[in-house]
């Protein structure tokens, strides 16, 4: 997968290219990341990249000419088929379904805004899609771009150590992940659930699915509203609710 970055701070992306899962993907040649700074396309000796907005108001906007030139250079490097994305609070909110959708693209160009944003005409003429990582304000688009890259890279074949990891992540099937345990078997009196030590893979799968459904119901119930549960899932969720109510009643009785 090829990803082009338009950013005033391309050095920030060393966190992606040098470390962790994405760093290994870059080293393996599975992920190719290139970056361009609008400053390198400024025409004055101060390398100016900001401009006052028409109509007044606080803050500055990214200057049109250096930004457009950087985008055009990235498009030329990418060749045909590159999707240009602007990281913006006004964009579609990124979720696992969106990540899966973006991962089908072989080429992405991510435009990271700064200051108060970019000229609307640049969005209209250069940007294919706008994406947001949440309803809050950040100083620029670099962190959202890194979030997008990290999440999308997990879908590239060969990036993860286990091919099933991406499909078993939280949200991959619309549910939160189940609890996980490792050694020691007992930690400060808390034991690993016996089913995980049983070696019965069918029961382990059933337990994990039940816990995933239950955790989603407890923490993110709105996610269940969009799911058509299978007969097995509905049964397991009902079991979890019954067990949870019993535990709550038991806890209240001890209080």
Curated annotation (Swiss-Prot):
This protein's UniProt keywords: Cytoplasm, Methyltransferase, S-adenosyl-L-methionine, Transferase, tRNA processing
GO biological process: tRNA N1-guanine methylation
Highest taxon above the source species: Bacteria
Class in the EC hierarchy, top level: transferase
TM helices/strands, residue ranges: none
GO-annotated cellular components: cytosol
EC number: 2.1.1.228
Pfam families, A to Z: tRNA_m1G_MT
InterPro entries xref list: Alpha/beta_knot_MTases, tRNA_m1G_MeTrfase_C_sf, tRNA_m1G_MeTrfase_TrmD, tRNA_m1G_MTases_N, tRNA_MeTrfase_TRMD/TRM10
Principal cellular location given in the protein's record: cytoplasm
Residues annotated for S-adenosyl-L-methionine binding in this entry: 113, 133-138
Entry keyword annotation includes S-adenosyl-L-methionine: yes
Subcellular location: Cytoplasm
Keyword S-adenosyl-L-methionine belongs to the record: yes
GO molecular function: tRNA (guanine(37)-N1)-methyltransferase activity
Cross-referenced HAMAP family: TrmD
Family: Belongs to the RNA methyltransferase TrmD family.
Subunit structure: Homodimer.
Protein task: Specifically methylates guanosine-37 in various tRNAs.
Name used for this protein in its record: tRNA (guanine-N(1)-)-methyltransferase
Organism, scientific name: Enterobacter sp. (strain 638)
């Amino acid at each position: 997968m090829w990803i082009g970055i338009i950013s005033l701070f391309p050095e920030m992306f060393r966190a992606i290219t040098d470390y962790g899962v994405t760093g290994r993907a870059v080293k393996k040649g599975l992920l190719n990341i290139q970056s361009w700074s609008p400053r390198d396309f400024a025409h004055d000796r101060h390398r100016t990249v900001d401009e006052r907005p028409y109509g007044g108001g606080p803050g500055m906007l990214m200057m049109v000419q250096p930004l457009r030139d950087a985008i055009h250079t990235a498009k030329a490097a990418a060749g045909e088929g590159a999707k240009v994305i602007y990281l913006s609070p006004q964009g579609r909110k990124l979720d696992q379904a969106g990540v899966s959708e973006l991962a089908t693209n072989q080429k992405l160009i991510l435009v990271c805004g700064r200051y108060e944003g970019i000229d609307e005409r640049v969005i209209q003429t250069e940007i294919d899609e706008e994406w947001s990582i949440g309803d809050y304000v950040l100083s620029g688009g670099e962190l959202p771009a890194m979030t997008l890259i990290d999440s999308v890279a997990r879908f590239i074949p060969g990036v993860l150590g286990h091919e099933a990891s991406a499909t078993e992540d939280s949200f991959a099937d619309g549910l939160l992940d189940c609890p996980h345990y490792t050694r020691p078997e007992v930690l400060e009196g808390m034991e690993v659930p016996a089913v995980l030590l049983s070696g019965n893979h069918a029961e382990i799968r059933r337990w994990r699915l039940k816990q995933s459904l239950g955790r989603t119901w407890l923490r993110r119930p709105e996610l269940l509203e969009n799911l058509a549960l299978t007969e097995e899932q509905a049964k397991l969720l009902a079991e979890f609710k019954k067990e949870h109510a019993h535990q709550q009643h038991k806890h209240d009785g001890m209080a």
